[in-house]
Amino acid sequence: MIWHVQNENFILDSTRIFMKAFHLLLFHGSFIFPECILIFGLILLLMIDSTSDQKDIPWLYFISSTSLVMSIAALLFRWREEPMISFSGNFQTNNFNEIFQFLILLCSTLCIPLSVEYIECTEMAITEFLLFVLTATLGGMFLCGANDLITIFVAPECFSLCSYLLSGYTKRDVRSNEATTKYLLMGGASSSILVHGFSWLYGSSGGEIELQEIVNGLINTQMYNSPGISIALIFITVGIGFKLSPAPSHQWTPDVYEGSPTPVVAFLSVTSKVAASALATRIFDIPFYFSSNEWHLLLEILAILSMILGNLIAITQTSMKRMLAYSSIGQIGYVIIGIIVGDSNDGYASMITYMLFYISMNLGTFACIVLFGLRTGTDNIRDYAGLYTKDPFLALSLALCLLSLGGLPPLAGFFGKLHLFWCGWQAGLYFLVSIGLLTSVVSIYYYLKIIKLLMTGRNQEITPHVRNYRRSPLRSNNSIELSMIVCVIASTIPGISMNPIIAIAQDTLFF
């Protein structure tokens, strides 16, 4: 009898919870419709994987890519709608958040074709790989729209857990296992530091968790200039620093880049930067509005260290992926300039524009690395010598992406950096912009060093990897080359038409 009553109570409680969740989804689901499309794609992948004995690989890729493209279409369809707060204050939808969600979806859409042949050659589990990519994308999208401390903590953890699993996906590779262990340990430590900073923010504001309510709480409690806020700022900056990977929070980056599967590195190198930048802009600009001088100083130090250390250490690297790891550390220093400038002087617009170009430049470079690695089995920079004599198309594509990363005119990277530095100069960040210009020259040096190797025709410099280079006859190469062509075009042509891109970015500058 007692068991029967308890069972009925359990059923009633479960029904209430389900009805409440259904009610929230029914009345607020339109606000997270792009995320719902991804969730439906995830469910569809799981259903196909559990019901089908034979894996239809093209069909799995089609479902993943279609769900991402449909999410992008849903975002564009609701462009310029009024900002709304939904799910009892957990999420906020506006153009500023949606532009970051668009960038994350764009990264994932371009990364999936890069992984097709790689996964087939390495015989990795396909369904799980796609599930992790889509789930990480979902976590990044929720992070961009998060409006309270709990969601801001849970969403990046969803992204991070999938990132840990993806970085260690090649379980037989010792380097991959080592990279995953370091990534997991440092990621766990940074998450604990971040949540500790949130606890100081929560207590100082009188128990508020929504971002705008935290500001109101700090005003009511007169704690907006207290030592507690300074402590919260330091801990949160360190926690976000791990996600952005500026110096000195960059130790995990080179090992993870070198040890992880190359398509995974391509995915993490852009999506993590976009998601962390979205988090940084909202956290620093809203709850720490009254501490702008303090967090400006902290970010300036991080930007200077990142630009100097990242670009100087990149010169000495012999692995292409490690070189790009240190290059990305330097690149995030440029992005931080836009975060510091903020809403004034088009700082956010310049940051968004540069990140759009960075996605195309970086993914284009990684597409070339994936293709070269599959055909030669090496990642050593020295082994790229003479590639132009065997595969001019691949060599020219890699050269264009590297030159754009370095910021040479008239490529997109040059105009992106020019606008970013100009906004920083107008905001009075003269020293920071000067460091950025000098380190950009340093980056051009090591990019040109690689391009010189690509174009060499002297037999004594060409390694056996290029001498025995053969273009793969596999049809699946087309997907990698398609992503590569799209990224190369996006790294070159948009630089000529900067004004429309900047104008679109400027339209997103409201919260």
Swiss-Prot record:
| Pfam families referenced in this protein's UniProt entry, alphabetically | Ndh2_N (PF19530), Proton_antipo_M (PF00361)
Membrane-spanning parts: 24-44, 57-77, 99-119, 124-144, 149-169, 183-203, 227-247, 295-315, 323-343, 354-374, 395-415, 418-438, 484-504
State the HAMAP family in the record: NDH1_NuoN_1
> Which GO MF terms are attached to this record?
NADH dehydrogenase (ubiquinone) activity; quinone binding
This molecule's function is given as: NDH shuttles electrons from NAD(P)H:plastoquinone, via FMN and iron-sulfur (Fe-S) centers, to quinones in the photosynthetic chain and possibly in a chloroplast respiratory chain. The immediate electron acceptor for the enzyme in this species is believed to be plastoquinone. Couples the redox reaction to proton translocation, and thus conserves the redox energy in a proton gradient.
Q: What is its main location?
A: plastid
Q: Which family does it belong to?
A: Belongs to the complex I subunit 2 family.
The lineage's top-level taxon is Eukaryota
**SUBUNIT field:** NDH is composed of at least 16 different subunits, 5 of which are encoded in the nucleus.
Indicate what this protein is called per its UniProt record.
NAD(P)H-quinone oxidoreductase subunit 2 A, chloroplastic
Protein keywords = Chloroplast, Membrane, NAD, NADP, Plastid, Plastoquinone, Quinone, Thylakoid, Translocase, Transmembrane, Transmembrane helix, Transport
Membrane topology recorded in Swiss-Prot or TrEMBL: Multi-pass membrane protein
Q: What is its EC number?
A: 7.1.1.-
Query: Cystine bridges: which residues?
Result: none
Q: Name one GO biological process term.
A: photosynthesis, light reaction
Can you list the GO cellular component terms from the UniProt entry?
Answer: chloroplast thylakoid membrane
Subcellular location per UniProt equals: Plastid, Chloroplast thylakoid membrane
Which reaction equation describes what this protein catalyses?
Answer: a plastoquinone + NADH + (n+1) H(+)(in) = a plastoquinol + NAD(+) + n H(+)(out); a plastoquinone + NADPH + (n+1) H(+)(in) = a plastoquinol + NADP(+) + n H(+)(out)
